[in-house]
């Protein structure tokens, strides 16, 4: 079936049509975006600058997750911030397809990375004596390759489905971004089958990975019965951060993509949560509960202060 699109651009309704609310949206989400990119890139730089952290699979995955969060947020948030300054918010057909592809690509990669991080914690807690031999560089590289490939396949399937839809008008999207269900409502054809394919593709990757995560942590919790109280506390503290991130990311995704298409006002709020707020919260969750990351950040800060003092002394 050849794409029969006549629409050259879409109009986004955004979060609100009220000018006062749009001003608040601009200020709040500009601050959130700066904090998101700054916080996540700080973790990336910290891990890359700390050899002791970089050789650890857990921190390797954490750095990769932070990079993904910065990219994922940058796909949607900057345009949303700029659009809040305008009464009419438009996006070209090509721009809409690119946004849709990038959103699902980075989300698909992140889903698999979170699953890989759960497996890393499973091996570290349940098979500590074999951790170094199992979680070696080769396996970490394979897991990253699987994540990139899985995200690419997922986004390619979504975009190929969307390109088959004819858009002949209207062109108003009741959202602040291009997403599958709002686009299905605008298609000039019966989208029942396409809606089911969205559920199968997006819902499948969410539910399968979420199930693997649940199994991993169920096994971890069962294995903690044989650990000392100190060992249990350390394991729970390490896993707690990851569990919080998993819940914050997966629950909104499953809510949005595992149901049939319908006009549901809470979709916008769910999208704000997993696209904008979740990448902001991830650095806070991991750094506040992780002594090694905080110590590495202090060392980097101290080195910067030393370099700054040396430059001042040279000027004098």
Swiss-Prot record:
Residues carrying sugar: 3
Extracellular compartment residues: 1-23, 79-99, 158-194, 258-268
A Gene Ontology term for the protein's cellular component: plasma membrane
Subcellular location as annotated: Cell membrane
Domain of life per record: Eukaryota
Cysteines engaged in disulfide bonds, as pairs: 96-188
SUPFAM superfamilies: Family A G protein-coupled receptor-like (SSF81321)
Cytoplasmic compartment segments: 48-56, 120-138, 218-234, 289-316
One Pfam assignment: 7tm_4
Annotated TM spans: 24-47, 57-78, 100-119, 139-157, 195-217, 235-257, 269-288
Keywords assigned by UniProt, alphabetized: Cell membrane, Disulfide bond, G-protein coupled receptor, Glycoprotein, Membrane, Olfaction, Receptor, Sensory transduction, Transducer, Transmembrane, Transmembrane helix
Coarse class of the protein's main subcellular location: membrane
Membrane topology, as annotated: Multi-pass membrane protein
Function: Odorant receptor.
Family statement drawn from the similarity comment of this UniProt entry: Belongs to the G-protein coupled receptor 1 family.
Name this polypeptide is given: Olfactory receptor 4C15
Gene this protein is translated from: OR4C15
